[in-house]
From Swiss-Prot:
One of its GO terms (cellular component) is eukaryotic 43S preinitiation complex. The keyword tRNA processing does not apply. Disulfide bonds: none annotated. Belongs to the eIF-3 subunit I family. InterPro entries: eIF3i, WD40/YVTN_repeat-like_dom_sf, WD40_repeat_CS, WD40_repeat_dom_sf, WD40_rpt. CDD domains: WD40 (cd00200). SUPFAM superfamilies: WD40 repeat-like (SSF50978). This is Eukaryotic translation initiation factor 3 subunit I. The gene is tif34. WD repeats lie at residues 8-47, 50-91, 93-135, 150-189, 194-233, 291-330. It is found in: Cytoplasm. One of its GO terms (molecular function) is translation initiation factor activity. Component of the eukaryotic translation initiation factor 3 (eIF-3) complex, which is involved in protein synthesis of a specialized repertoire of mRNAs and, together with other initiation factors, stimulates binding of mRNA and methionyl-tRNAi to the 40S ribosome. The eIF-3 complex specifically targets and initiates translation of a subset of mRNAs involved in cell proliferation. Gene3D superfamilies: YVTN repeat-like/Quinoprotein amine dehydrogenase (2.130.10.10).
Length: 340
C-alpha cells in the first residue's frame, strides 16, 4: 500500500472528507485554506479561500454541489464546489467546531464553541440548491430553522442519523446525546466514554444506523443511532482523535497519537502516530499503517471501501489505496461462513 502524499497545507490538518462518489477529497487545516483533491491520483483541483481563521471542519453535500466549512473566525461558509466561490456566510458569536449535511442534503448543522459567556449550541439551517445546476445558490436562509443549546456540557462534534431522524452529538464530558432532528428535543444521553474525556470525532456507518466515536480516553465505541446502545469497544494505547467505519470489510480505522503539545523529542514509534485497523465485530487490532510524523487528527474512508485517507499534525494528507491482501484478509469463522 503505497500512500499518495498530498502536501497543500502549511499547518496541521483538522478534518478531511471524501464526497459521496469518492472521486474528490476535501481537506481543511489551521492555515485558513480549504483544498480539493482528486482522490485517485492526489492531484490538487484547487482551493477555497476566504476564511480569516483556522478552519476546524468541512463537509460536502451528498450531490457534491455545495461545500460547508466552519472556522475559528466565527463563521460557517457555504461554497460552490465547482467554481470555488463563496455563496453564503453565516456569522456566530463563537468558533464553529463541526458542520454536517443531513443524509439528503436538505439541512446543515453547525456546532458552536462555548466561550465568552455564550453556551455551546447546535444550529440547523435549511439548504437551498437553486435550480439544481449549481446556479442561484446564494439564496440561503439567514437564520437557523432550529437551535439546540447544550447547557450541561458543550457539544464537540455532531452528525445526523439515518433519514436525518436524529441529531447525534458527542460532548466534552464524554457523553453522547440524541436529539430529535425536527424539534431539537433531547431524547437520550449516555455516558459513553470516561467522564471528562472529550469525544473528538463521530462518524457514521454508510446506512447511518450506527456510528463510531473517538475519545481522549484512548478508546473508540461503536454505538447504535436508534437507542445509543454501546455495541462494541475498541481499546487503543493512545488518545484518539478520529475513527471511521470501513464499507466492504468489517473493519474500523482509528487515528490518534500522543497529543501534539505532549510530544517531546520521542521517536515516531513512541508517539504511536499510526492508523490502527480493528476488526469491527471481534474488536481485535489487526494492523497498523505508519507514515505520519505527528498525531493523526482525522481519518476518512472512501465510500466504496477501496481507500482511506489520514490527515496529521504534520500538515500532510496521506491517501492509501488498499491492495488485494486487504480484501482477502478474513478470520477463520468468516471463511467458514463463506464455505457454507
Amino acid at each position: 500500500m503505497r500512500p499518495i502524499l498530498l502536501s497543500g497545507h502549511e499547518r496541521s490538518l483538522n478534518q478531511i472528507k471524501f464526497n459521496r462518489d469518492g472521486d474528490l477529497l476535501f481537506s481543511v487545516s489551521k492555515d485558513k485554506v480549504v483544498c480539493a483533491w482528486w482522490s485517485a491520483n492526489g492531484e490538487r483541483l484547487g482551493t477555497y479561500t476566504g476564511h480569516q481563521g483556522a478552519i476546524w471542519t468541512v463537509d460536502v453535500s451528498p450531490n457534491t454541489v455545495l461545500l460547508a466549512t466552519g472556522s475559528a473566525d466565527n463563521t460557517v461558509r457555504l461554497w460552490n464546489v465547482k467554481t470555488g466561490e463563496c455563496v453564503k456566510v453565516w456569522d456566530f458569536p463563537t468558533a464553529v467546531k463541526r458542520v454536517a449535511f443531513s443524509p439528503d442534503g436538505s439541512k446543515l448543522l453547525a456546532v458552536t464553541e462555548k466561550r465568552m459567556g455564550f453556551l455551546g449550541t447546535i444550529a440547523v439551517f435549511d439548504i437551498n440548491y437553486g435550480n439544481g445546476q449549481g446556479e442561484d445558490l446564494e439564496n440561503q436562509a439567514e437564520e437557523p430553522s432550529l437551535r439546540i443549546t447544550c447547557s450541561e456540557s458543550k457539544a464537540t462534534v455532531a452528525g445526523w442519523s439515518y433519514l436525518g431522524k436524529y441529531i447525534i452529538a458527542g460532548h466534552e464530558d464524554g457523553s453522547v446525546s440524541q436529539y430529535d432532528g425536527k424539534t431539537g428535543e433531547q431524547l437520550e444521553n449516555v455516558q459513553a466514554h470516561e467522564f471528562d474525556h472529550q469525544i473528538n470525532d463521530i462518524q457514521f456507518s454508510q446506512d447511518r444506523t450506527c456510528f463510531i466515536t473517538a475519545s481522549k480516553d484512548k478508546s473508540a465505541k461503536l454505538i447504535s443511532s436508534r437507542n445509543l446502545a454501546i455495541l462494541k469497544t475498541y481499546v487503543a494505547d493512545t488518545p484518539l482523535n478520529s475513527a471511521t467505519i470501513t464499507p466492504k470489510k468489517d473493519f474500523v480505522i482509528l487515528g490518534g497519537g500522543q497529543a501534539a503539545m505532549d510530544v517531546t523529542t520521542t521517536s515516531a514509534r513512541q508517539g504511536k502516530f499510526e492508523a490502527r485497523f480493528y476488526h469491527k465485530v471481534f474488536e481485535d487490532e489487526i494492523g497498523r499503517v505508519k507514515g505520519h510524523f505527528g498525531p493523526l487528527n482525522t481519518v476518512d474512508v472512501h465510500p466504496n471501501g477501496t481507500a482511506y485517507a489520514s490527515g496529521g499534525e504534520d500538515g500532510y494528507v496521506r491517501v492509501h489505496h488498499f491492495d488485494k491482501p486487504y480484501f482477502d484478509f478474513m478470520y477463520e469463522v468468516e471463511r467458514e461462513q463463506l464455505r457454507k
